[in-house]
């Protein structure tokens, strides 16, 4: 764990050429930086002040903006300075080297860790900050903002407090059994409250991994026979040439991936080898991987040649599959074609037929998977899910006629697991796991 007595610093922006670079300092001795750079101006808290920065030989390093946030009203809860200088590699190096003589370089996530330890955020809010930094699409950012606002913290704190209240009643029986436990109505209230929490947590867990999927991206696989236009469609959706497009069958053997944004939703798109019987061991391995990836995918786009539409025999219909008639250059329009009771969408990348409709259909499927119409808090990480599952298991063991000590212990352990999600309990392994994923300077 970190030594919070040390004053830390780090570059909070990307190292490289830029208009502005931001360097953050936090700790009890933050204001020493003013003398270290020979800053003579009076710095007013929470106001931007233009200053000149000098080295020890009184040579000007750069001029920039300094903002001072006194404790406890800062991001970390400590004295914080944010120094904005020109995004020059040389300037950044000089300033960081000079700061290293009096302060300690922050570890990844150490500023956020101090914010957590000083009660500025709970663990789920801290994770929300990390998710916002990593967000690549509008919907990912929206989910992260909701988490930063404390949506999960309020939910889990409420459930935990309800458990603590129940446990206090159980503990009271241990000390005064004749006053409480004899009341049958009280027993029923306790049992009903526990069962209510069991139902709420079960519903929370049975969310089809919506939050985790949104963080990670929806996996979509383009599948079909060789030379049916998979790579052409892949490149079109990716908006760049990644896959080799060839008239020869079997060109794609390895699985190719592209991270794309459709309607604000993150999509991990895969182009796979054409499915067919092959005596070539390398192609056969590619086909085997294609089948495995297709099976594991959240959604499939299965391509059939438009010119062979009258010979299509679609034996297995899957609601997680979009059926497409590819190379439909001769199609009159993009109206779905019904084949064997299944809707097929004709598309032509060459003529732009059906492409917008396909994108709209992918967006609709993504909305269904992510549950865009639901406004309830969602689990966003496996860490949350593991603790919630353990809490549920403890509550499911609850039986009102169990030994009183066993009842109390199950309630205590369930509350412990809920506390572990938001960081009320101080488990070093949990904190190290959460903050190690942050970048330096955050």
Curated annotation (Swiss-Prot):
Keyword Repeat: no
CDD domains referenced in this protein's UniProt entry, alphabetically: trmE, TrmE_N
Sites where the protein binds GTP: 227-232, 246-252, 271-274
The protein's enzyme class: hydrolase
Residues covered by the TrmE-type G domain: 217-367
Binding-site residues, K(+): 246
Principal location class: cytoplasm
Residues at which Mg(2+) binds: 231, 252
Cofactors (names): K(+)
Cofactor notes: Binds 1 potassium ion per subunit.
Gene Ontology cellular component list: cytoplasm
Keywords assigned by UniProt, alphabetized: Cytoplasm, GTP-binding, Hydrolase, Magnesium, Metal-binding, Nucleotide-binding, Potassium, tRNA processing
Subcellular location as annotated: Cytoplasm
Protein's job: Exhibits a very high intrinsic GTPase hydrolysis rate. Involved in the addition of a carboxymethylaminomethyl (cmnm) group at the wobble position (U34) of certain tRNAs, forming tRNA-cmnm(5)s(2)U34.
Quaternary structure and interacting proteins, as annotated: Homodimer. Heterotetramer of two MnmE and two MnmG subunits.
Full protein name: tRNA modification GTPase MnmE
Gene name per UniProt: mnmE
């Amino acid at each position: 764990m970190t030594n919070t007595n040390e004053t830390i610093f780090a570059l909070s922006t990307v190292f490289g050429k830029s208009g502005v670079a931001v360097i953050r300092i936090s700790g009890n001795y933050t204001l020493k930086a003013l003398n270290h750079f020979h800053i003579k101006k009076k710095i007013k808290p929470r106001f931007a002040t233009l200053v000149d920065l000098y080295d020890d030989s009184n040579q000007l390093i750069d001029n920039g903006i300094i903002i001072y946030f006194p404790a406890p009203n800062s991001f970390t809860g400590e004295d914080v300075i944010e120094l904005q200088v020109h995004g020059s590699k040389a300037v950044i190096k000089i300033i960081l080297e000079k700061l290293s003589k009096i302060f300690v370089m922050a570890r990844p996530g150490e500023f956020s860790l101090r914010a957590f330890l000083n009660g500025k955020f709970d663990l789920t809010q801290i994770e929300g900050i990390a998710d916002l930094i990593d967000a690549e699409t509008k919907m990912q950012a929206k989910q992260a903002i909701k988490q930063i606002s404390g949506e999960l913290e309020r939910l889990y704190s409420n459930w935990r407090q309800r458990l603590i209240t129940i446990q206090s009643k159980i503990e009271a029986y241990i000390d005064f059994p004749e006053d409480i436990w004899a009341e049958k109505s009280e027993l029923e209230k306790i049992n009903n409250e526990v069962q209510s929490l069991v139902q709420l947590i079960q519903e929370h867990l049975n969310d089809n991994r919506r939050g985790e999927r949104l963080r990670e991206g929806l996996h979509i696989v383009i599948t079909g026979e060789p030379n049916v236009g998979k790579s052409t469609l892949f490149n079109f959706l990716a908006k760049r040439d990644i896959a080799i497009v060839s008239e020869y069958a079997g060109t794609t053997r390895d699985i190719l991936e592209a991270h794309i944004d459709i309607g604000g939703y993150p999509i991990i798109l895969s182009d796979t080898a054409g499915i067919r019987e092959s005596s070539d061991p390398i192609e056969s391995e590619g086909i085997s991987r294609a089948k495995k990836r297709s099976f594991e995918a959240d959604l499939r786009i299965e391509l059939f040649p438009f010119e062979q539409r009258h010979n299509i025999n679609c034996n297995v219909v899957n609601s997680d599959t979009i059926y497409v008639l590819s190379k439909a250059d001769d199609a009159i329009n993009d109206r779905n074609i019904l084949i064997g009771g299944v809707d097929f969408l004709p598309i032509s990348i060459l003529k732009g037929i059906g492409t917008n409709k396909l994108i709209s259909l992918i967006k609709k499927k993504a909305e269904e998977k992510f549950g865009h119409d639901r406004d309830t808090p969602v689990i966003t990480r496996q860490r949350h899910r593991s603790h919630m599952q353990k809490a549920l298991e403890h509550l499911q063991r609850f039986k009102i006629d169990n030994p009183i000590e066993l009842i109390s212990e199950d309630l205590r352990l369930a509350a412990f697991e809920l506390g572990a999600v938001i960081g009320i309990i101080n488990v070093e392994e949990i904190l190290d796991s959460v903050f190690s994923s942050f970048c330096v300077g955050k």
